[in-house]
Structures are given as structure tokens and as C-alpha cells.
């Protein structure tokens, strides 16, 4: 049987010094026979999705201790993409994912922890911790801080979120008073932003991967029911320890749970619910860490067979994550996918032996357990707060309408192809991605004129100056992992196109990425990126670009000979922006750029450079 890793520092005469230090943290004689479970918290006062996490690590710790473990908490960093967006702060967002993964690895391995509870929530924190969990491969369970409640105002007919505040701010017809009202109303509570943006998408995907508990992605942060998720996560961590160290059960480990089949399940869910394109980047990165052979070709294959069963903000103003929960949450979507023959239901989870068992118990349309029905009635209270578990509001009824409700069955799918697609062509040899859930069907095939910019800032300036016209393809390059560096999100350009009335009349192509709040014909992750010699670096103003989503194509409409000639010319000049950009690239960012791969590899470090 495997021995507790912690014995390295808790057993033997020569470890007297280490035990003395452990005792100084509060451990006593009887504790040295117990598993030491690390709690990776991510509390910070900078991020609304994390402001309420301060005491929650200790909540989990006390539960771990109650059921026979020793808990030791530490914190990671957390960057708020919305606050960092639109300026050089966004250069740090994606690189922070690697720092988070490294910091969890450093703490867990330095102290020989036996298991791990990951308390995450927002955009790069869940992916960073997921990468670390698959790297470490010790018993691990995820529990997130939960989604924010959607905002409300008398000035809008629909519920609000962050994107509404951003779009109206750039709408010249909106009064200052209306902008201020949207700003005050869009983000009313603690939690991750209320739509199917990156944070919520990733927290939902941990349910499909099998690494978190039902409801992890959908119970609002303010609801009392989420407290039980935290307590149960502590108990599950101890149970996983017993299964691995006491029974050598491989399905107690992240790599025994998050297998190739589980990654396919997660991507199937992502496509079905029209999640953020960032999830592709993060799933690819996690797969690399777990040595799972899951790649862009698998995503492309799945995107052609998985229907879209759910459409949530920003793809529609009608539904937010709180509405997904009322409809049965992620387990309900997984249930519909399973009945459509689209899932690997023998995959393991941290809370059930198989996904099939989990669905049987947690799918609101199938279970007879009234406790499950009550759980999924947990709803928003509409009271602004930064306090977790501060309300216990419940809907009067569940949304189980699978023909016209928030979650559809396969027979009533919103579209027969899902909400994400991978496009290939001479402009993106290794692929690029588009959230088709947010694209109007009238522009699924779009031919436009290239307007080339070598920074997000230049593109924003041009859009706000009304220099971008209907029929243009805005090309923003040298914003990839190396070229940015840091692969900035392009939420401001897409939001401003929408506010200028060009959301259905223009396209945007970039080697950068998009916020989960992006909608419209926004194509990102062009690989290889310009800084790595990608053909997006060869596009010129006035070129014609054809985007063909149904046929998964994206091409620069020039001859192969002309493209080769441009490549030779660019090789001679070097693959870098023509003009020096007014951004400060620090040593930390340069170190990230030196090792970063393009988006088709998840923008992870190029291990060949390290191993070589």
C-alpha cells in the first residue's frame, strides 16, 4: 500500500526537528499518524469572486479534523481579469495561471502533504489549481466560491452582468445617469461573474471532470447550501485519502478520475452549454499536465457531434448561472447528454463510483430524492452583499421544461452542433476557436476586409473613433502567449464593436484570447501566433478573409505563392510588431514568454526547452 507522503517529515528520529516545527503549528502526538491535507485557498480582497473566501478554508479545515485528518491552509494569488482588462495589467492574467500552479506544487511538495482541497473560483485560479492537481496526482477535491447573483435595475428589462456595464459605457446614446445605474447594479454580490463566462465555465467543467461535487459550478456564492459543499469537500478529501493510502484505489487520484474519457466529457459539456473559449485553452493545459493525449483535434471532432442544449449570458440576456441551477445544474445537462449517448458514463468521480451513478442520483428529472429537488431550488436573494452563505432563498419550483426551458434535451436542442468550434485554414494552420453560441446564424459564413492592428490598444482606439466599418475583419496580432506577452483578452474591442452597432456586421480575429463575456463573430487563439511565425502575422490591410463556420474553415484569400512571398519577407524582417508598443514588459513577463507555447498547446511551458 502507498504510505502517507507526510511520513517523510513526521516519522523517524532524524525528523525530530521537523516534528518540532509541526508541533509549533498546533500538531500533537496523535496527529502524526493522520493524513496531512493541504487546503489551497485563494482569498483576496482584489477579486469579487474571492472576497468571501477568507474564513472558508478554516471551515473546511475544521471538518477535515472532525473526520480524522490534519488540515493545513495556504493561499495563492488571484488576478481579477475584469479589473486588469484594458491596460497592461491584462499581460499578467494568463501567466498568473502558471504561477498559481507552481505555488500549489511548491507548497504541497515542500511539506509532503498527502491530499489537497482546492478552494478556487475565478478565471485563472481554477485552471491553475487544476494543472497543479494533475501534476501532483494526490487525492484532490475542488470546491469553488460560487457564482455571483445577476444584477437588476428598473432601467433594463433583463438581468444584468459585467458585460452590460461595459457595453453601455461605450454607447454614445446612453446618459451618464444610465451608465452609472448599470455600473452600480451589474455586480451586486460576491462571487464569480454571473454569466457563463470563464470562471463559471471552468467551475462547471470540474463537475464533468469528476473532481468536484454536484452544484459546485452553479449554487450562488451567497446561498447557505454552498456551506454544505465546503463541509462535504473536507469529508471527501479524507475519504479519498483512505481509498488511496488504505486501498490503493487509482480512482481516488486526479489522473485516475480526469482520464481521456473525462476530458471528453468535460469538453462535451462545454460545447453543449456554450462555455467560454478560454476553457479550451485551460483544458488543453490541464491535459498536458496530466499527460492525457487530449488535443485540438478531439475538440474539433466533438464540436461536430455535440448539440447545444443551453444558452446563457453573454449569449442571451434571458438566463444566467442561477437559472442553470434552477433547471438542475450541470448534472441535468450531463443527464441529457448521457441519454443522447454522448458521454462516457463509466468515468469515475470524487463523490460517486461512476458518472452514471452520479447522474442517477442528482439529475432532477430522474431522481426521486426530494433533497436533490430542494437543493436545486436554491436561488438568489437580490440583496447586495460580500458575505458567503448569507441567504437561504428558494425558487417555488424547478425549471424542468426540456423543450423550451433553460436546459434542453437533445430532441429540442438549440442547435445540432454545439456552442464551440475549431476552425482551420491558411491563416491558422494549427487551429483557432470561436464560440458559435454567441454568433448570429446570419454571419456563420462571413467574407470581410482585413483591418490589421498590432495591439489591442490600437484596435480599441480605431473602433471608438468609428474607423472600423461594417464588413471589416478586425485582425489583432502579436497578442499571443509570446507576442503579448500573456495572451490578453479582447473583451473591450468586442464590447465596443457591439456598442457601435457592429456586433453582427464585423468579425474579429486574434492570436490573443477572449473573455468568457465575449459574444459575436470573435475568433481567437490563432495558432501558431504571429510571434511564432503564424500566418496571422502575414495579413495586410485590405486583404479578404473568408470565415466559414459550417465547414470549419478560415482562410486568407490570396494565392499560396503570394503567401510564401510574404513569409520570406517577414522572415527577413523578424516576427515582431512594426512599431514599438507603449507597454512595459517586465522580467517576469519575459520569462513567461520565453517558454510559452501557442494556444493550441494550452499556452503551457514548452517542456522541450526545459528538458533539452
Swiss-Prot record:
Enzyme Commission identifier(s): 4.2.1.9
Record's keyword annotation contains Mitochondrion: no
Cited function: Functions in the biosynthesis of branched-chain amino acids. Catalyzes the dehydration of (2R,3R)-2,3-dihydroxy-3-methylpentanoate (2,3-dihydroxy-3-methylvalerate) into 2-oxo-3-methylpentanoate (2-oxo-3-methylvalerate) and of (2R)-2,3-dihydroxy-3-methylbutanoate (2,3-dihydroxyisovalerate) into 2-oxo-3-methylbutanoate (2-oxoisovalerate), the penultimate precursor to L-isoleucine and L-valine, respectively.
Pathway: Amino-acid biosynthesis; L-isoleucine biosynthesis; L-isoleucine from 2-oxobutanoate: step 3/4; Amino-acid biosynthesis; L-valine biosynthesis; L-valine from pyruvate: step 3/4
Broad EC category: lyase
Organism of this sequence: Xanthomonas oryzae pv. oryzae (strain KACC10331 / KXO85)
Keywords (A to Z) from UniProt: 2Fe-2S, Amino-acid biosynthesis, Branched-chain amino acid biosynthesis, Iron, Iron-sulfur, Lyase, Magnesium, Metal-binding
InterPro entries documented for this protein: Dihydro-acid_dehy_C, DihydroxyA_deHydtase, DiOHA_6PGluconate_deHydtase_CS, ILV_EDD_C, ILV_EDD_N, IlvD/EDD_N
Chain positions found as N6-carboxylysine: 124
Reaction(s) catalysed (UniProt annotation): (2R)-2,3-dihydroxy-3-methylbutanoate = 3-methyl-2-oxobutanoate + H2O; (2R,3R)-2,3-dihydroxy-3-methylpentanoate = (S)-3-methyl-2-oxopentanoate + H2O
Binding site for [2Fe-2S] cluster: 122, 193
Any GO CC annotation of this UniProt entry: cytosol
One function term, GO molecular function aspect: magnesium ion binding
UniProt-recorded name of the protein: Dihydroxy-acid dehydratase
Lineage, broadest ranks: Bacteria, Pseudomonadati, Pseudomonadota, Gammaproteobacteria, Lysobacterales
Amino acid at each position: 500500500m502507498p504510505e502517507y507522503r507526510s511520513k517523510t517529515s513526521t516519522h523517524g528520529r532524524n525528523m525530530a526537528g521537523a516534528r518540532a516545527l509541526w508541533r509549533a503549528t498546533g500538531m500533537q502526538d496523535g496527529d502524526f499518524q493522520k493524513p496531512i491535507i493541504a487546503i489551497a485557498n485563494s482569498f483576496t480582497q482584489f477579486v469579487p469572486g474571492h472576497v468571501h473566501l477568507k474564513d472558508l478554508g478554516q471551515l473546511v479545515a475544521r471538518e477535515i479534523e472532525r473526520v480524522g485528518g490534519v488540515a493545513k491552509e495556504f493561499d495563492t494569488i488571484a488576478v481579477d481579469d475584469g479589473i486588469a482588462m484594458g491596460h497592461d495589467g491584462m499581460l499578467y492574467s494568463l501567466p498568473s495561471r502558471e504561477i498559481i500552479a507552481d505555488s500549489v506544487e511548491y507548497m504541497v511538495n515542500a511539506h509532503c502533504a498527502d491530499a489537497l482541497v482546492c478552494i478556487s473560483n475565478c478565471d485563472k485560479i481554477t485552471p491553475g489549481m487544476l494543472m497543479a492537481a494533475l501534476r501532483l496526482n494526490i487525492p484532490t477535491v475542488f470546491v469553488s466560491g460560487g457564482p455571483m447573483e445577476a444584477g437588476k435595475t428598473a432601467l433594463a428589462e433583463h438581468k444584468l452582468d459585467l458585460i452590460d456595464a461595459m457595453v453601455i459605457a461605450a454607447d454614445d446614446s446612453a446618459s451618464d445617469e444610465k451608465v452609472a445605474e448599470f455600473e452600480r447594479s451589474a455586480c451586486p454580490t460576491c462571487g464569480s461573474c454571473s454569466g457563463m463566462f470563464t470562471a463559471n465555465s471552468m467551475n462547471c467543467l470540474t463537475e464533468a471532470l469528476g473532481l468536484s461535487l454536484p452544484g459546485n459550478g452553479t449554487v450562488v456564492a451567497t446561498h447557505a447550501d454552498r456551506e454544505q459543499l465546503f463541509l462535504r469537500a473536507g469529508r471527501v478529501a479524507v475519504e479519498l485519502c483512505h481509498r488511496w493510502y488504505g486501498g490503493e484505489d487509482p480512482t481516488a487520484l486526479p489522473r485516475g478520475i480526469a482520464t481521456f474519457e473525462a476530458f471528453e466529457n468535460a469538453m462535451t459539456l462545454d460545447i453543449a452549454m456554450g462555455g467560454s473559449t478560454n476553457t479550451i485553452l485551460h483544458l488543453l493545459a490541464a491535459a498536458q499536465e496530466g499527460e492525457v493525449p487530449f488535443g485540438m483535434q478531439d475538440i474539433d471532432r466533438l464540436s461536430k457531434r455535440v448539440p447545444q442544449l443551453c444558452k446563457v449570458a453573454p449569449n442571451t440576456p434571458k438566463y444566467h448561472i442561477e437559472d442553470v441551477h434552477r433547471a438542475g445544474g450541470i448534472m441535468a445537462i450531463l443527464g441529457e447528454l448521457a441519454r443522447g449517448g454522448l458521454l462516457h458514463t463509466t468515468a469515475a468521480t470524487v463523490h460517486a463510483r461512476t458518472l452514471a451513478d452520479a447522474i442517477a442520483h442528482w439529475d432532477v428529472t430522474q431522481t426521486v430524492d426530494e433533497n436533490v429537488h430542494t437543493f436545486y431550488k436554491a436561488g438568489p436573494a437580490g440583496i447586495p452583499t460580500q458575505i458567503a452563505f448569507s441567504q437561504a432563498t428558494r425558487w417555488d419550483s424547478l425549471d424542468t421544461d426540456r423543450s423550451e426551458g433553460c436546459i434542453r434535451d437533445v430532441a429540442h436542442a438549440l442547435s445540432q452542433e454545439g456552442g464551440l468550434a475549431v476552425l482551420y485554414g491558411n491563416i491558422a494552420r494549427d487551429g483557432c476557436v470561436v464560440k458559435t453560441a454567441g454568433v448570429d446564424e446570419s454571419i456563420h459564413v462571413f467574407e470581410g476586409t482585413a483591418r490589421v492592428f498590432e495591439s489591442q490598444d490600437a484596435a480599441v482606439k480605431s473602433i471608438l473613433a468609428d474607423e472600423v466599418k461594417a464588413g471589416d475583419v478586425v485582425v489583432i496580432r502579436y497578442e499571443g502567449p509570446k507576442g503579448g506577452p500573456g495572451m490578453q483578452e479582447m473583451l473591450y474591442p468586442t464590447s465596443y464593436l457591439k456598442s457601435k452597432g457592429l456586433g453582427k456586421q464585423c468579425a474579429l480575429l486574434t492570436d490573443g484570447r477572449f473573455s468568457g463575456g465575449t459574444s459575436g463573430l470573435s475568433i481567437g487563439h490563432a495558432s501558431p501566433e504571429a510571434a511564432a511565425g503564424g500566418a496571422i502575422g502575414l495579413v495586410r490591410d485590405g486583404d479578404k478573409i473568408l470565415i466559414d463556420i459550417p465547414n470549419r474553415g478560415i482562410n486568407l484569400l490570396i494565392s499560396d505563392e503570394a503567401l510564401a512571398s510574404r513569409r520570406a519577407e517577414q522572415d527577413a524582417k523578424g516576427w515582431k510588431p512594426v512599431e514599438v508598443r507603449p507597454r512595459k514588459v517586465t522580467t517576469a513577463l519575459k520569462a513567461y514568454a520565453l517558454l510559452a507555447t501557442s494556444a493550441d498547446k494550452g499556452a503551457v511551458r514548452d517542456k522541450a526547452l526545459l528538458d533539452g
